[in-house]
């Protein structure tokens, strides 16, 4: 297959705009699956977390054949926290499918990835998805996309983009809203006619940039990337140029190309195609695999720096080691450093305490996905409150600023603007959206967003959406007020009982029900006042010899607040930690002993 018959395309979209569903439709209609094969929904989201959250975290590769042309499709994460994945992927492709929701229009994360794609001079095709959704306005969205392209400095060729109207869920796509259609073939045809074949030297010494790493229990590390020059053959000796300019030698053990969702073994692949190869043990993202006689490095995309850091440490609580398989600092250290091999936007630093590690990432979601993955693998650990990473620019302390877009019901807008204002947010735009909603844009310090999402969902009664993306660094904006309510802290170790909880719930809201094991210093609820109070939730009712009438025994408890990992991370303050185990997520104070805590608080007050 010469490279005239290859097209490499990435799909860019905001979270939940239907990108993975569209890839499903393309795969099904290119007859990749046998007629009797059962196909799951969202086949590209391969890990459990992706399926549960409905987001794509890792970029995936697939390929389809249409009229003798091989179309390599790369599915990219839509969330800005996984921007490191997106930037690498764009180096492998010659064009992008920009997928936009016909109801919501272009969103901030779409904007960031699109900006990167346009700067690399990739050819865009715009797909307006969910045209079957009630209240949507596809024509208005096309105008918004055009405005966005102009704002991002697209050249004349990029501004002349084709528009396809689609409903990925129903498996249809058409070139105009009036057309009838029962398939997505026009997407294939537009890709073939609009996106140019890869410009590569088929002759010449082999060269390939590693854009992704896969892992197979049998084959070990698998390097994924596009062949930039020459031909790579099964069994050929190669040179590996590292990011630090060191060169090592290796040999290609097995060579694969993509077809549908599978890797197909091949003997050789020419420039222009996306391949996977095994056999090189110490291969990493950003390395260049070349002809052994002509090692030449390909420059690698600079990945955006992390903006948020958290401390991961060994669980030293009273229940440590009960529920997890991997509990020591060596286990945690090895797992974090292994994660660095694939997760290019992550940074891990050892601290002056052997049992703690500072982990930095692109945002709260980026880090919480890592914590959740480790939890499912059987790890036990403590994590601290996220902190933003400050920078010094021209002698001035600067902090990361996010661009925040909220879409809220009109009757909640005043409350939301006031709360964001308190968190040092500045409103930059406000416009009416469909169906009694208002869309407001803000610039806000990343610190101000930590812990706000849960409050936002409460204020909008679950009917609002908020999306943010890193914008720039600006001078430090000053203190932001923290949580206004204190906590209810367990006073002794034991099992919670209804009587103790009934007395505790008069002071605030509870996080636990009866029959839960607690320890001294564990946070069991939220106080209605500003200070923390110690409370005994294990306290039994003293028995008397007076017969009860029955009514005073029937103590009614309010159902406890369920805390997900994200909510727990957002909730804690600087003197608190989240204890993460495979079975439980607990909140606790850093100092468990109540008397020591009181002494610390008094000495701080004196300072």
Specify the residue positions occupied by each region the protein language model found.
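Gly-rich Lys/Arg/Thr-decorated short loops/hinges at beta-loop-alpha junctions or inter-strand turns
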Residues: 40, 67-71, 91-97, 126, ...
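Conserved P-loop NTPase nucleotide-binding/switch module
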Residues: 86-100, 105-149
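Canonical P-loop GTPase G-domain recognition
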Residues: 123, 133-193
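Accessory interaction regions appended to the cores of large information-processing enzymes
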Residues: 162, 189-193, 197, 220-607
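Short boundary/loop segments of OB/S1/cold-shock single-stranded nucleic-acid-binding domains
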Residues: 196-197, 209-217
């Amino acid at each position: 297959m010469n490279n005239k018959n290859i097209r490499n395309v990435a799909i860019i979209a905001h979270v939940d705009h239907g990108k993975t569903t569209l890839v499903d439709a393309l795969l099904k209609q290119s007859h990749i699956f046998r007629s009797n094969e059962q196909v799951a929904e969202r086949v590209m989201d391969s890990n459990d977390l992706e399926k549960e959250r409905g987001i794509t975290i890792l970029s995936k590769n697939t390929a389809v054949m249409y009229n003798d042309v091989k179309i390599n499709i790369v599915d990219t994460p839509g969330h800005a926290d996984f921007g490191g994945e997106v930037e690498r992927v764009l180096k492998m492709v010659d064009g992008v499918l920009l997928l936009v929701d016909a109801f919501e229009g272009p969103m901030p994360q779409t904007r960031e990835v699109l900006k990167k794609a346009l700067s690399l001079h990739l050819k865009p095709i715009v797909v307006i998805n969910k045209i079957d959704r009630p209240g949507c306005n596809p024509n208005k969205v096309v105008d918004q996309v055009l405005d966005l392209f102009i704002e991002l400095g697209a050249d004349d060729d990029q501004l002349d983009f084709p528009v396809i109207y689609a409903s990925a869920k129903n498996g249809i796509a058409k070139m105009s809203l009036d057309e009838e259609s029962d398939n997505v073939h026009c997407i294939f045809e537009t890709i073939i006619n609009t996106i140019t074949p890869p410009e590569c030297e088929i002759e010449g010494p082999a060269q390939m940039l590693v854009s992704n790493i896969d892992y197979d229990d049998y084959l070990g590390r698998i390097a994924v990337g596009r062949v930039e020059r020459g031909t790579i053959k099964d069994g050929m000796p190669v040179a590996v140029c590292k990011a630090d300019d060191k060169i090592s030698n290796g040999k290609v053990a097995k060579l694969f190309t993509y077809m549908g969702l599978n890797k197909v073994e091949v003997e050789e692949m020419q420039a222009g195609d996306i391949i996977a190869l095994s056999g090189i043990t110490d291969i990493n993202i950003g390395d260049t695999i070349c002809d052994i006689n002509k090692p030449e490095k390909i420059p690698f995309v600079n990945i955006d720096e992390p903006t948020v850091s958290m401390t991961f440490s060994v669980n030293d609580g009273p229940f440590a080691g009960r529920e997890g398989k991997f509990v020591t600092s060596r286990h945690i250290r090895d797992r974090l450093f292994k994660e660095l091999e694939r997760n290019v936007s992550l940074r891990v630093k050892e601290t002056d305490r052997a049992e703690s590690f500072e982990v930095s990432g692109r945002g709260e979601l980026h880090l919480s996905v890592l914590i959740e993955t480790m939890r499912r693998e059987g790890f036990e650990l403590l994590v601290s409150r996220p902190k933003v990473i400050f920078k010094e620019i021209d002698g001035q302390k600067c902090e990361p600023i996010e661009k925040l877009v909220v879409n809220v019901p009109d009757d909640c807008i005043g409350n939301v603007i006031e709360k964001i204002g308190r968190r040092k947010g500045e409103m930059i735009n406000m416009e009416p959206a469909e169906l009694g909603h208002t869309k407001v844009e803000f610039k806000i310090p990343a610190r101000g967003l930590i812990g706000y999402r849960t409050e936002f969902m409460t204020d909008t009664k679950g009917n609002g959406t908020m999306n943010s993306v890193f914008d720039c660094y600006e001078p430090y904006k000053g203190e932001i007020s923290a949580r206004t309510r204190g906590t209810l802290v367990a006073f002794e170790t034991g099992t919670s009982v209804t009587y103790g909880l009934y007395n505790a719930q008069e002071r605030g809201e509870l996080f636990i029900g009866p029959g839960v094991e607690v320890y001294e210093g564990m946070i069991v609820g939220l106080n209605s006042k500003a200070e923390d109070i110690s409370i005994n939730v294990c306290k039994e009712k003293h028995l008397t010899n007076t017969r009860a009438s029955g009514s005073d025994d029937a103590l009614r408890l309010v159902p406890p607040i369920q805390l997900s990992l994200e909510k727990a991370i957002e909730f804690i303050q600087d003197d608190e930690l989240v204890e993460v185990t495979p079975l439980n997520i607990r909140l606790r104070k850093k100092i468990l002993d109540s008397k020591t805590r009181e002494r610390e608080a008094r000495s701080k007050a004196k300072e």
